[in-house]
From Swiss-Prot:
<dbReference type="GO" id="GO:0043022">
    <property type="term" value="F:ribosome binding"/>
</dbReference>
<dbReference type="Pfam" id="PF01176">
    <property type="entry name" value="eIF-1a"/>
</dbReference>
<dbReference type="GO" id="GO:0019843">
    <property type="term" value="F:rRNA binding"/>
</dbReference>
<dbReference type="InterPro" id="IPR006196">
    <property type="entry name" value="RNA-binding_domain_S1_IF1"/>
</dbReference>
<keyword id="KW-0963">Cytoplasm</keyword>
<keyword id="KW-0648">Protein biosynthesis</keyword>
<comment type="function">
    <text>One of the essential components for the initiation of protein synthesis. Stabilizes the binding of IF-2 and IF-3 on the 30S subunit to which N-formylmethionyl-tRNA(fMet) subsequently binds. Helps modulate mRNA selection, yielding the 30S pre-initiation complex (PIC). Upon addition of the 50S ribosomal subunit IF-1, IF-2 and IF-3 are released leaving the mature 70S translation initiation complex.</text>
</comment>
<comment type="similarity">
    <text>Belongs to the IF-1 family.</text>
</comment>
<dbReference type="InterPro" id="IPR012340">
    <property type="entry name" value="NA-bd_OB-fold"/>
</dbReference>
<keyword id="KW-0396">Initiation factor</keyword>
<protein>
    <recommendedName>
        <fullName>Translation initiation factor IF-1</fullName>
    </recommendedName>
</protein>
<feature type="region of interest" description="Disordered">
    <location>
        <begin position="70"/>
        <end position="93"/>
    </location>
</feature>
<dbReference type="GO" id="GO:0005829">
    <property type="term" value="C:cytosol"/>
</dbReference>
<dbReference type="InterPro" id="IPR004368">
    <property type="entry name" value="TIF_IF1"/>
</dbReference>
<comment type="subunit">
    <text>Component of the 30S ribosomal translation pre-initiation complex which assembles on the 30S ribosome in the order IF-2 and IF-3, IF-1 and N-formylmethionyl-tRNA(fMet); mRNA recruitment can occur at any time during PIC assembly.</text>
</comment>
<keyword id="KW-0699">rRNA-binding</keyword>
<dbReference type="GO" id="GO:0003743">
    <property type="term" value="F:translation initiation factor activity"/>
</dbReference>
Amino acid sequence: MAKEELIQFEGLVTEILPDARYRVQLDAGHEIVAYTAGKMKKNRIKTLAGDRVTIEMSPYDLEKGRLIFRHKDERPGGGPPRGAPPRGQFRRR
């Protein structure tokens, strides 16, 4: 049996749920529950409410998805958010 084709959508994280799950508003208007993909957990990529993400879904269940990519911010330079302490401020021993 062949592996089914997965569908990719883009959306916006609206709410963080327990157990590394997120409520995501898709660009098409639907709202789904998505979980973090294993590679994102392994690389400790954090996702916050308001982040743009790419979701992978099975054509058989369009209510759940896997969060596979967090898009970088549109801030110029893609640097840290305002108010964050500059890197290298604290000395490591």
